[in-house]
Amino acid sequence: ENYLTILDYKSSAHSFNFSDAYYGLAMQMITYLDVALLNADKLLAGKTLPAGAFYLHVKNPFIKQNSFMTLEDYQKTIITDYKLKGLLLNDTAVLDLIDPAVESGQASEIFTFKKLKAGNLGKNDDLITLDDFNHLIAKNRANMVEAGEKILSGDLKLDPIKERPYTPTVSGPYRAISQFDNTLPENRYRKYIKLSKEDVLSKIKEEIEGHNQESNEEGEEQ
């Protein structure tokens, strides 16, 4: 088995938002991972599984120095400032492969996981199971298909989220062009209910199981 990780380079700091992923507002990183996994057989022999997907903030960090700093201290500070945030496979054996320097009772300097003294992993929202990875990828694909079908059917209406007032077409300089007016019946905000990691993963699992059940029932009828 092979394990694959991807980096999504960003010009600002990012962390994975499960609610945004569910509503199709954060599709880029999961799409990169999906495409990499789909094409992994062209580069690697055998089965390839996801080990992680991370945001990397591209920047020239400013290091605040209160006292004399050795080269080693400086390098550690830089590494900490570039710590990768995103999604990690909740598997100790796999994490040992991607950061073998982490021992029991230590936190990784590169990733956002910590090994407890008992050898298990500390609780962390970045840690998810293999099924969770597959479910997030499936939901991301479903969001893309839904968006594509709407475009092809001519459904091009503005569909902003009220909790995102920075959306340029709603409150920014392009509002005069978009002509978005919530008092009109054709202009409505999309509902955005903030969901926890657990809620998102549970809802996606239920949706997938429901879809599979419907597909099986249709197959039996035919």
Predicted ranges, named:
Residues E1-Q222:
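Structural signature of nuclease core domains in nucleic-acid processing machines
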